[in-house]
């Protein structure tokens, strides 16, 4: 299950329980104190400074200041938000969600896949400037599949009864009908196959949004949806959330077609704190599912995936 980001008002944002024998007890810590964590699989050889925000452990890269990503322009903000910028970013460290206030503002609408070494390796290859296109696409497709499967887990199911080959009655569940996918062209199309691999008959719509050359604002050039999309739950696919402007325009188009924000689940691979915050502020009922929140997003994704870098 994805991790919901919460920061209850009834308790301090920091000083949650830590699974480390060498870590001081919560009573000995003050809000904001760093905790040295020397445990953890392949990362045992390097201590990492961890800030505990709500129920999520957010590790801060050494080269970034703890307040750098909140209320300030990001390195990727110069892009249009289309996720197709040709510039490469420096390989990122662990996820960073900003301060407690950001977590309060975003809340449970932002869900993170549980971090493990497999996901971190895929993220590393995608961010690696020297990775071959073959390795990049292979890793991207694997990460997309993980995000899509967790996205399907957010959809409604209903109980059902089936009969096994031996005549045994088995109580299980099945999807409730009425789901569809919508990809934001062009980088969102990279996620379509991952969705079809999990749902062979699902209908997929498309939106093309680009920045206007004069105003630099996102502009809708094309939109094609299932005719009854207003009755469906929507998996909106866009791998990189930088400014959030492109997604905001896409959601506005969906609303114009009768879709309620509460039935939209945004599937992405990487998000900046600014992008996630902007979307949730505009549409508080939308759900965002991603693998990482970090000030620097790999905005070269679309160009490298489709071989136009």
UniProtKB/Swiss-Prot annotation:
Record keyword Nucleus present: yes
Q: Which positions does the record annotate as the modified residue Phosphoserine?
A: 25
- Where does the UniProt entry say this protein principally localizes? cytoplasm
For bias type Polar residues, the affected ranges are 13-26
Q: Where does GTP bind?
A: 133, 142, 176-179, 203, 232
Q: Which GO terms describe its molecular function?
A: GTP binding
| Protein name listed in UniProt | Uracil phosphoribosyltransferase homolog
Gene responsible for this protein: UPRT
Q: Which family does it belong to?
A: Belongs to the UPRTase family.
In residue numbers, the region (Disordered) covers: 1-41
Task: Provide the binding site for uracil.
Answer: 299-301
Q: Where in the cell is it found?
A: Cytoplasm; Nucleus
Task: Tell me the residue numbers annotated for binding 5-phospho-alpha-D-ribose 1-diphosphate.
Answer: 186, 238-246
CC per GO annotation: cytoplasm; nucleus
Q: What's a Pfam family this protein contains? A: UPRTase
Give the UniProt keywords, A-Z: Cytoplasm, GTP-binding, Nucleotide-binding, Nucleus, Phosphoprotein
């Amino acid at each position: 299950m994805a991790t919901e980001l919460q920061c209850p008002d009834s308790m301090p944002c920091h000083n949650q329980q830590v699974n480390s024998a060498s870590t001081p007890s919560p009573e000995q810590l003050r809000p904001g104190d760093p905790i040295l964590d020397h445990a953890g699989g392949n990362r045992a050889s390097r201590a990492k400074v961890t800030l505990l925000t709500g129920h999520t452990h957010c590790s801060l890269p050494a080269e970034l200041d703890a307040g750098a990503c909140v209320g300030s322009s990001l390195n990727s903000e110069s892009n249009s938000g289309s996720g197709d910028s040709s510039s490469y970013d420096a390989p990122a460290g662990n996820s960073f969600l900003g301060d407690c206030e950001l977590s309060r503002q975003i809340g449970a609408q932002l869900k993170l896949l549980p971090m493990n070494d497999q996901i971190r390796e895929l993220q590393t290859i995608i961010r690696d400037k020297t990775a071959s296109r073959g390795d990049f696409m292979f890793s991207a497709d694997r990460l997309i599949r993980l995000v899509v499967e967790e996205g399907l887990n957010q959809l409604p199911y209903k109980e059902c009864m089936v009969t096994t080959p031996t005549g045994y009655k088995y109580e299980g569940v099945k999807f409730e009908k009425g789901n569809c996918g919508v990809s934001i062209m062009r980088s969102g199309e990279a996620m379509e196959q991952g969705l079809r691999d999990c749902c062979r008959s699902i209908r997929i719509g498309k939106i093309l949004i680009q920045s206007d050359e004069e105003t630099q604002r996102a502009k809708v050039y094309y939109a094609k949806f299932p005719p009854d999309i207003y009755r469906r739950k929507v998996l909106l696919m866009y791998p990189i959330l930088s400014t959030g402007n492109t997604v905001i325009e896409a959601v506005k188009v969906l609303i114009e077609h009768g879709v309620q924000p509460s039935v939209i689940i945004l599937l992405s691979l990487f998000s900046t704190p600014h992008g996630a915050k902007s979307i949730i502020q505009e549409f508080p009922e939308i759900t965002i599912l991603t693998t990482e929140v970090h000030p620097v997003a790999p905005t070269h994704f679309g160009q490298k995936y489709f071989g136009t870098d």
